């Protein structure tokens, strides 16, 4: 057991270093950019988004970057989304509302909605964004300036995650921990290794010519995790993508409460693991060994496990402070967070892997 405890301690020491390197080397959107430049087509799929769609639309219409068109694909919403979009389109001609059609065989709903939006778009740059996002007024201009400066095919913008309530504060930091602690994201910004491709519904901005060259969303028509798939497709073609911190400009509350988090990630976590039962099992075992077992052994007074818990805590405090998350949850919630995501992994594997049926936003589809 001491050998295992030593391995876990070394692994967390490396994770601590990796977190520091990522925080130092993942660039922020620094350039404010001008008000003019190439036409940017913002494409938003909206399915039953009455809760925040108006905030999102108004944030994009308030951008200081003037050469912008906003395309929202109303993906057959059954709530007030359509009425909210009609009202805002009547007030500003830059908002184009498309009424989404039923997906053809072989297509999932979101990639089909994005594909429809891309066919209508006229922009040299395409910005794919989810429907529950707030962008500060200079965000689009800053993203365009960074892409032009660095000559990349695609940029992914990382947000600030708004959290309220117990389970959101416990579970949602896993997304940031994955990017900043588990992955060498800084290395992905300097290579075209496909497996380091990171995409996000909070902002994938891509040059039209590169989007078309990789086949657009038609090449991702059955992708459950289409945003990550887009980044990896770009990288597989030999093109560069970069990740930028935009947590001072972009914010969203992704899910409201633990049940929404559970349901939301049930639909796509197994897909994110490559639909591999082996990888799902490995992630569960690793989650216990590297993230929960040290806390259990620390209770017995095992010295290296106590040191591991200290390293985990310092790593979380450092990351949470940088991202402006609540520090009290950094101190104690790590094993509970990992246990929660273990449950999500099991549920996602069962529902989408074994049963192969997903219900989301009032729609059922084959996983």
Segments from the language model and where they lie:
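Acidic donor-binding/catalytic loop of UDP-sugar-dependent glycosyltransferases
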Residues: 80, 129-146
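Catalytic donor/gating beta->alpha subdomain of glycosyltransferases that bind UDP-sugars
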Residues: 147, 154-181, 209-212, 217-279, ...
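N-terminal membrane-anchoring/stem segments of glycan-assembly enzymes
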Residues: 1-36, 173, 185
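Short, well-formed alpha-helical segments that are part of the catalytic scaffolds
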Residues: 21-29, 49-62
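Membrane-embedded multi-pass helical conduit in multi-pass membrane proteins
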Residues: 34, 279-355
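Long helical/loop segments within the catalytic core of UDP-sugar-dependent glycosyltransferases
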Residues: 17-22, 96-119, 142, 146-213, ...
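Cell-envelope/extracellular polymer assembly enzymes that use nucleotide-activated donors
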Residues: 38-41, 69
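Acidic donor-binding segment of Leloir-type glycosyltransferases
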Residues: 57-104
């Amino acid at each position: 057991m001491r050998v295992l405890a030593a391995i876990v301690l070394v692994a967390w020491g490396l994770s601590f270093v990796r977190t520091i390197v990522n925080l130092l080397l993942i660039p922020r959107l620094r350039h404010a950019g001008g008000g003019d430049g190439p036409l940017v087509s913002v494409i938003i799929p909206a399915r039953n988004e009455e809760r925040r769609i108006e905030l999102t639309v108004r944030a994009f219409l308030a951008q200081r970057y003037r050469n912008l068109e906003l395309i929202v694909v109303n993906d057959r919403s059954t709530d007030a989304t359509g009425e909210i979009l009609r009202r805002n389109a009547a007030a500003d001609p830059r908002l184009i509302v498309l009424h989404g059609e039923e997906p053809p065989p072989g297509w999932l709903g979101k990639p089909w909605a994005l594909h429809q939006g891309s066919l209508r778009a006229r922009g040299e740059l395409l910005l794919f964004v989810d429907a529950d996002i707030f962008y500060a007024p200079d965000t689009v201009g800053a993203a365009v300036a960074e892409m032009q400066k660095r000559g990349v095919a695609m940029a992914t913008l990382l947000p600030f995650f708004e959290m309220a309530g117990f389970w959101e504060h416990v579970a949602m930091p896993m997304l940031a921990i994955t990017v900043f602690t588990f992955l060498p994201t800084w290395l992905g910004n300097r290579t075209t290794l496909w497996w380091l491709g990171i995409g996000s519904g909070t902002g994938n901005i891509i040059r039209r010519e590169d989007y078309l060259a990789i086949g657009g969303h038609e090449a991702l028509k059955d992708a459950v995790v289409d945003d990550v798939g887009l980044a990896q497709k770009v990288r597989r073609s030999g093109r560069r993508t970069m990740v930028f911190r935009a947590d001072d400009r972009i914010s969203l509350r992704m899910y409201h409460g633990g049940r929404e988090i559970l349901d939301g990630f049930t639909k796509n976590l197994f897909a994110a693991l490559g639909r591999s039962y082996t990888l799902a099992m490995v992630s569960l075992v690793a989650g216990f060994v590297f993230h929960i077992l040290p806390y259990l052994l620390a209770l017995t007074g095992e010295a290296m496990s106590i040191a591991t818990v200290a390293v985990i805590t310092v790593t979380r405090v450092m990351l949470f402070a940088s991202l402006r998350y609540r520090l009290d949850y950094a101190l104690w919630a790590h094993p509970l967070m990992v246990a929660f995501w273990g449950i999500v992994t099991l549920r996602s594997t069962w529902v989408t892997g074994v049963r192969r049926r997903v219900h989301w936003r009032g729609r059922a589809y084959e996983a």
